């Protein structure tokens, strides 16, 4: 979706991202073109970025993912990115949503992606963090007052319709429902909302299909932009 907006000459002044969205956000804010971000991931597998946990806090650890981020970003800290990025994670110790605007990028993005049970929580400066989507899966409000207009990009339906009865599958599906529920009020705060349908056949972990997912998002955004153009309206739904 970012690629379509990019081609339409629409560039953000600030970006808010959570979970997988925070990954794309920091790479884009670091100066990479959307298709370059796709290239980074399409040759990787889920196993390249994770390893089995030897503790009891989660099934997998994200040390390899943190190293991957650190190696492929040109800067270390959020405040050094070319475009400001707000990364949302969930403070597990205090039961609240936290919006990171500074500090180590890789650690904070890993925290935002640490789905409970599947991944070990991330410890940052003595506090444990898990996936930002637990409390805020569509973090619009964290930047709403700083923006004249906001475009929301939603790809959260990345979950298969069919699922097996394993403890992991059940947990992931339950999290998905919870994440969807807490995003409803945030979506209403967008001036333009673009959502990608047809992603129900993909898993969050199918990195080999990242190009297919990219194209679905690209086409969805282009369809919205084309429809607005045909109606002779701007992306803010005002007359041209």
Language model regions located:
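Patatin-like phospholipase
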Residues: 1-18, 26-240
């Amino acid at each position: 979706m970012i690629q379509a907006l990019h081609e339409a000459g629409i560039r953000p002044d600030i970006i808010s991202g959570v979970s997988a969205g925070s990954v794309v956000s920091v790479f884009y804010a670091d100066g990479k073109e959307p298709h370059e971000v796709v290239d980074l991931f399409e040759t990787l597998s889920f196993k390249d970025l994770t390893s089995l946990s030897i503790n009891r806090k989660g099934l997998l650890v994200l040390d390899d993912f943190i190293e991957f981020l650190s190696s492929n970003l040109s800067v270390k800290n959020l405040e050094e990115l070319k475009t400001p990025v707000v990364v949302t994670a969930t403070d597990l110790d205090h039961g609240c949503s936290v919006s990171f605007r500074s500090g180590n990028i890789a650690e904070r993005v890993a925290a935002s992606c640490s789905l409970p049970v599947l991944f070990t929580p991330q410890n940052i400066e003595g506090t444990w963090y898990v996936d930002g989507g637990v409390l805020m899966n569509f973090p619009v409000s964290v930047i709403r007052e700083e923006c004249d207009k906001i475009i929301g990009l939603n790809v959260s339906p990345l979950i298969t319709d069919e699922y097996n009865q394993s403890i992991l599958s059940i947990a992931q599906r339950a999290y998905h429902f919870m994440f969807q529920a807490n995003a409803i009020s945030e979506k209403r705060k967008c001036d333009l909302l673009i959502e990608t349908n047809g992603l129900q056949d993909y898993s969050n972990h199918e990195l080999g299909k990242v190009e297919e997912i990219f194209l679905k998002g690209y086409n969805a955004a282009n369809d919205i932009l084309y429809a607005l153009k045909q109606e002779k309206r701007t992306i803010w739904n005002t007359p041209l």
